[in-house]
Each structure stands twice: as C-alpha cells, then as structure tokens.
Amino acid sequence: MSIKGDSPSSTNASSSPKSTYSIQSDDKANLGSGNVDIRTDNSQQDSNNRRDIVVVTRVASEETLESQSSTSSMGIRPESSFNYEDASNQARVEMNNRVHGSNMNTINKYYPVRFPKNNERQLSDTNNLNEKVQGTHTVQSSTQEDKILDGDTSNSQVTPSLNIAEFPTDKLLKMLTALLTKIIKSNDRTAATNPSLTQEIENGRCLALSDNEKKYLSPVLGFRGKHVPQIGLDQYFQRIQKYCPTTNDVFLSLLVYFDRISKRCNSVTTTPKTNTAKHESPSNESSLDKANRGADKMSACNSNENNENDDSDDENTGVQRDSRAHPQMFVMDSHNIHRLIIAGITVSTKFLSDFFYSNSRYSRVGGISLQELNHLELQFLVLCDFELLISVNELQRYADLLYRFWNNAKAQSQALVTGM
C-alpha cells in the first residue's frame, strides 16, 4: 500500500498548506522521498482478485506538519521516539514489505466460525428433531385426511380436523356439495306438507306479519326463483372455481353466513307463547349440527331399520305439527340455493380475499344478469345485517363439523353396502 501526495505547488510547498489525497496500492511501496509516486499494477490486482486494506494518510508540507498539535485529527499520537526518516532505505523497504505481507495474509485467510463441541452437538440434535417433527406431522395429517375421506373410523380417539389452508379445494367442494344437497333434498321433500313463510305468501295466503318479519321478507323473496336451475351444485361449484377461483375460507364462509341468516330470519317469525320454549333451542342450532346429529342417529340405528323408520315418522310428524304453528321464513331449497351461493361468494370474496373479480364476471359465471347480482349482493348484506367478520375459531369449528359430516356420510354408505 502506498500513497501519493502532492501540494498545489511543488516548488513552494511551505507557502500553501493545502494538500491533496491520492491512494494507490502496490505490492512494493517506496517511501524514500517527500513526493511519492508509485503507480498501481492493475493487471496484477485483477489476477490476484483480492482486496487491499485502504489506509487514508494525509501528506502535507513540513511546515503544516510542524504547526499541527501533538495529537492528530484521528486521535492518534505519533511516536516521538521513532523517526521513520532516520532509518536506512533497506530497513524501510523491509519493514514496508513485512507490514504489507502480514496484512494481505490476514485478508486472504478464511477462518470459519468454530462452535464448541457441545453447541455443535446441540445444533445437530435440534435440526434432526425439527426434521423428524416436520416429517411426522406431514405424514400424519395426510394420512388422517385420507382416512377420513375414505370413511375410516377405526381410530375413534382421533378427532376429525380440517386444515383450511392446505386442504385440497376440490375435495372441500365435494364435501360442501354433499352437505348442501342433503339439506336441499330434505327441505324439498317437506315443502308440500310444511311450506315456509315465503312459500305461503307466494301461494296467495295473507298472513299477519310483524315489523321484523317484513324487514327480512323482501330480501328472502329476492333469492327465490320461479324455476329450478338444471345445473347441479357440484357442477355449479366447479364452474365457479374454474372461472372465478378462490380459497377454501371463502367456500367455508358460506356455511357461516347461511346459518347466520337462518337464525336471524327464523327467530323473528311469529311463535305461539306455549311453543316458545320448545322451539328456542332448535332455532339456535346450526344446520351442520342438525345434519351431524341426524347422521349419528342414522348410523346408530342402522341395525334396526324398523325402529329407524318409526322414529323418523314420529319425528316428521312432530316437525309438521310444530312447523304449522311456526312457519320458517328462510329455507334453503332448489329454488334459491344457486342465487345464495353466487351472491355469498361475491360478498365473501370481496371481504375475505385480497383478489376478487368484477360483478359482471360473477354474474356471467353464475348465470344471472348484472342488475340481479347487484340487487342480490345488497340483499345478502341486509340478511347478514352487514356482519361479515368471521373469527378463526368459528371458521375452524364449521370446517371440523363439515369434516365430521363427511366422515359420518362415508361410514353410513359403507354400512349400507355391507348390509346389502
């Protein structure tokens, strides 16, 4: 490392205290004269491909150095006992080469960080443990999902749990389709003997409605179509996922919103005082709980078909007697389920997802006009009372209930096949 310093006037250095800075590097440095001029060997520097320690040194005139204090601007006191100029030329060259060589050796050497043996052993053990835990967790979750999807209930201690983030969307749509299809078929069968409040109004019956009933009657009637769409729910969900793809939480939120609408609309209907306590608990029960409760009852009574038929007849009779006195306002059936799904996905995607499509795209995919979708979107918000926030625990609870329903349905189908 060598330094080139020149004053503005080389002939009269003492008259001008200003000095310039010039830094150059070379393997051989010569500090013999006041004005040092050593050029850098760029080819050698590029071939070695190494970095030099750059030391900035101020070269000034003798008068400027004498006028400075004993302490420099960097805070380093010069050694008064050693005079570099007094040394011989050979000694100066040897000292410069020794310092330069030691600096370059320090730079070129690579010293890896060494941990103590205990730390290395602990680090390796921790990495191995993390790999084992991650591998075990992945295998167990995939195995558990496959077992539940296949209807395997041999391990009763394992509680069915659905991983919302990693669960395949196509499998989730199959489960969601199975649940909604069961609810719709059940409501369609009881529509003739147990019509809902909206169906009675459509049939021309004039009923005395309260203010709360009138508040939700118009939004509920907006989703009811005159004709049943020919497309099934499985194809409808696949069409939505193909042209307007979204995440699992959006599809699961449909169950949450449908249950909220059902509880809110059916709780405001006129109920006789004698039957208020009797209908209080079922109105607060979700459709998933009812489906799972019915599935558990059917699986438990599968060995005795006669008792099952008698219980179902008694239950249907009781439901008919109670429902005549307490008609429900919001009932999901084949006439309104498609509009509820496309409106719910439109609202849920805009609220839960960072990416969503325009209403014109949703309307074309859903098979309705843009004006109708805009109207249904507003009516859906009114039915939800503009409460769209869903907590993580609530969404996970509905996902687990859906998982449990799918598990029970698979077990029932396998039991029926075995019994035949």
Curated annotation (Swiss-Prot):
Regions of compositional bias (Low complexity) in chain numbering: 7-22
Cysteines engaged in disulfide bonds, as pairs: none
Subcellular locations according to the entry: Cytoplasm; Nucleus
Polar residues bias locations: 134-143
Stretch list, region Disordered: 1-82, 134-155, 268-321
An example Gene Ontology CC term for this record: cyclin-dependent protein kinase holoenzyme complex
A Pfam family that the UniProt record links to this protein: Cyclin
Bias (Basic and acidic residues): 277-296
Record InterPro entries: Cyclin_PHO80-like (IPR013922)
Membrane-spanning ranges: none
Family: Belongs to the cyclin family. PHO80 subfamily.
Job of this protein: Cyclin partner of the cyclin-dependent kinase (CDK) PHO85. Together with cyclin PCL7, controls glycogen phosphorylase and glycogen synthase activities in response to nutrient availablility. The PCL6-PHO85 cyclin-CDK holoenzyme has GLC8 kinase activity and phosphorylates and inactivates the phosphatase PP1-2 inhibitor GLC8, causing activation of PP1-2, which then dephosphorylates and activates glycogen phosphorylase. PCL6-PHO85 also phosphorylates YJL084C.
Subunit structure: Forms a cyclin-CDK complex with PHO85. Interacts with the substrate protein YJL084C. Interacts with elongin-C, which stabilizes PCL6. Interacts with the CDK inhibitor (CKI) PHO81.
Miscellaneous section: Present with 1240 molecules/cell in log phase SD medium.
Name of the featured protein: PHO85 cyclin-6
Source organism: Saccharomyces cerevisiae (strain ATCC 204508 / S288c)
